[in-house]
Swiss-Prot record:
This is 1,4-dihydroxy-2-naphthoyl-CoA hydrolase. InterPro entries: DHNA_CoA_hydrolase, HotDog_dom_sf. The lineage of its organism: Bacteria, Bacillati, Cyanobacteriota, Cyanophyceae, Synechococcales. CDD domains: 4HBT. Transmembrane segments: none annotated.
Length: 155
């Protein structure tokens, strides 16, 4: 597996496009949650986890996982308007909650100023039985590697 730095898989960038905005020229609120999910997918890919190894498929594509990671909670807060052409830095902070769930906190910045934050929480389930289960190994590794730069903290 290639050398990974936090810079290249937990710190991403996004440019606001015309199609992301509403008639007032600012992003429509739901875009932030879509961008958050896309940033999570990009982070996994940059870390070295392929989508087919993380997400079960119903398209007849053979996958190596029978675990689904549905979103069980999400929220977003906006601090400043976000408009067409804005170049945003997106920082991801993944946090393991227990052996079967985790959340990712997202901070969106424009010129080093926070413009929005989001949080997306996932729960691991067996995709066939829909019963709760442990997180898949790849997600475990991604969470562990993500936490290394934060050090040890008291629970």
């Amino acid at each position: 597996m290639q050398s990974k730095t936090l810079q290249n898989w937990l710190h991403l960038q996004r440019i606001v496009r015309f199609g992301d905005t509403d008639a007032a020229g600012v992003i429509h609120f739901h875009q932030l949650l879509r961008w958050s999910h896309e940033a999570w997918e990009e982070s996994l890919d940059r870390y070295g986890l392929k989508a087919v190894d993380v997400f079960p498929s119903s398209l007849g594509i053979s996958t190596s996982t029978s675990v689904a990671l549905p979103i069980v909670h999400c929220e977003a807060d906006f601090f400043l308007p976000i408009g067409i052409g804005d170049k945003l830095n997106v920082q991801l902070v993944p946090v393991r909650l227990n052996i079967g769930s985790f959340e990712v906190q997202f901070t969106f910045q424009r010129r080093e100023q926070n413009v929005a934050v989001a949080l997306v929480r996932h729960r691991s389930i067996d995709s066939d039985s829909r019963r709760l289960c442990d997180l898949p190994e790849g997600i475990d590794r991604w969470l562990e590697a993500s936490s290394l730069h934060r050090g040890v903290s008291a629970i």
